[in-house]
Amino acid sequence: MPTKAGTKSTAHKKTTTKGPSKSPKGKTHATALHQGMLYKDMVNVAKSKGIPIYQNGSRLTKSELEKKIRRSK
């Protein structure tokens, strides 16, 4: 029986985290503000400066793009 109670309590905890489903939207918005430039912006800057976005057949990561943009300044 105690194991069942344990699973029930965890299930309730999960529902509480899911409950304020509006909060993740706010969180992502806040983190986006703190990140500075978003990946989309990086791609646009790279395109305008003539920096290739693709390397070895795959897209560059945000950090790699950031480095290349910094170097090109």
Swiss-Prot record:
Transmembrane segments: none annotated. The keyword Ribosomal protein does not apply. Keywords: DNA-binding, Late protein, Virion. Residues 1-35 are annotated as: Disordered. Its main location: virion. GO terms for molecular function: DNA binding. Induction: Expressed in the early phase of the viral replicative cycle. The keyword Membrane does not apply. May play a role in genome packaging through direct interaction with viral DNA. Binds to ssDNA and dsDNA with the same apparent affinity in vitro. It comes from the Viruses. It is found in: Virion. This is Structural DNA-binding protein p10. It comes from African swine fever virus (isolate Tick/Malawi/Lil 20-1/1983) (ASFV).
